[in-house]
Amino acid sequence: MKNQAHPIIVVKRRKAKSHGAAHGSWKIAYADFMTAMMAFFLVMWLISISSPKELIQIAEYFRTPLATAVTGGDRISNSESPIPGGGDDYTQSQGEVNKQPNIEELKKRMEQSRLRKLRGDLDQLIESDPKLRALRPHLKIDLVQEGLRIQIIDSQNRPMFRTGSADVEPYMRDILRAIAPVLNGIPNRISLSGHTDDFPYASGEKGYSNWELSADRANASRRELMVGGLDSGKVLRVVGMAATMRLSDRGPDDAVNRRISLLVLNKQAEQAILHENAESQNEPVSALEKPEVAPQVSVPTMPSAEPR
């Protein structure tokens, strides 16, 4: 028994593998994070030192569609070659040339932003003043193609003027004097127009009519604005429209057609009015050279055989 062989027991032990390589993966993630942070602060620094003109060019670059860039459409630059230009030969026009931003379009956007801010200021003024808040149904403020339009509308229960005259009622006076200082906040000029209903005068169009009444009411509104503090020279035009531009489809004699329209003009509308009333630079027709008339040559014709 002592010489009996005992079975050999083999024990396999797994050696613990070193995780040194895995433990260093955080360094890669940290390096990526630091690279991203460096790129972020680099972009912020470049934005802070860039001029407004350069910022506009950068924005236009990122707004350029990929299809436009591939097909060679209108890009941020007008160069004939995608390769940046260089060299000492200034007579060559090929190469990358900076495209100037559309200054006129930028001015229009800024002006539109000013008009929207003015509308917000007027709404805030109306809401903050209990007296004006009660008159909110008589005010209509909207943005139109010519600028910001403020309409003060009449009603049967509360007219703006005394019947058939240009005497301003107290509530109308309060509105005009309250909005006058707000209008001084922007450089845009103003056009005032008076409107009436279609109810005719007994004397007809030959005497005092709705034309005179609408013009007188518009001018009376101008005076109240000046009393309220409107800057001199702010008003560009005062016109009377009579009943030619109805506001409501309920009838030509509806009370809402009696109104004062105050238009804060944008630059384009202002230039159109100035051009309309400017002295014409064209030469009179009599001063123009007469076109030369080619000499007429008479050609004998053959007599027709039969009348048709």
UniProtKB/Swiss-Prot annotation:
Changing A242 to T/V: Complete loss of motility. GO terms for cellular component: bacterial-type flagellum; bacterial-type flagellum stator complex; plasma membrane. Residues 50-308 are periplasmic. One of its GO terms (biological process) is bacterial-type flagellum-dependent cell motility. Changing G164D: Complete loss of motility. Changing S214F: Complete loss of motility. Its main location: membrane. Changing A39V: Complete loss of motility. Residues 90-101 have a biased composition (Polar residues). GO terms for molecular function: proton channel activity. Residues 1-27 are cytoplasmic. It is found in: Cell inner membrane. The keyword DNA-binding does not apply. The keyword Cell membrane applies. Residues 148-268 form the OmpA-like domain. Coiled coil: none annotated. The chain crosses the membrane at residues 28-49. It is a single-pass type II membrane protein. Changing G240D: Decreased motility, subnormal torque, tethered strains rotate very slowly. Pfam families: MotB_plug, OmpA. Keywords: Cell inner membrane, Cell membrane, Chemotaxis, Flagellar rotation, Membrane, Signal-anchor, Transmembrane, Transmembrane helix. Each stator complex is composed of 4 MotA and 2 MotB subunits; in E.coli 11 to 12 stator complexes can be involved in flagellar rotation. 2 A subunits and 1 B subunit are thought to form a single ion channel, so that each stator complex contains two channels. Belongs to the MotB family. MotA and MotB comprise the stator element of the flagellar motor complex. Required for the rotation of the flagellar motor. Probably a linker that fastens the torque-generating machinery to the cell wall. Overexpression of this protein with MotA improves motility in a pdeH disruption, (a c-di-GMP phosphodiesterase) suggesting there is an interaction (direct or indirect) between the c-di-GMP-binding flagellar brake protein YcgR and the flagellar stator. This is Motility protein B.
